[in-house]
């Protein structure tokens, strides 16, 4: 499933090694959020997290910020790893 796929990418740091994953990792993260929103009853809370992480992705790309910290936070807060 998508959750395990994202955990695998983050733990093995494939986003650094594979150009396809590097170019698409943020799309996979957005798909995961959309899946959570559609499946959960607490949509408002997840929607707020979604907006927060989308802003972080925007700033990460715009200012070339540290991806490692972003992925650790995403894994901890969203993937519960």
Where are these regions (language model features)?
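AAA+ P-loop NTPase domains with strong preference for DNA replication initiators
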Residues: 1-81
């Amino acid at each position: 499933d998508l959750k395990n796929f994202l955990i695998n990418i983050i733990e093995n740091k494939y986003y650094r090694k594979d150009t396809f994953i590097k170019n698409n990792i943020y799309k996979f993260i957005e798909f995961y959020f959309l899946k959570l929103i559609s499946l959960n009853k607490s949509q408002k809370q997840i929607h707020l997290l979604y907006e927060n992480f989308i802003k972080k992705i925007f700033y990460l790309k715009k200012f070339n910020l540290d991806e490692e910290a972003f992925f650790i936070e995403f894994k901890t807060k969203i993937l519960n790893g």
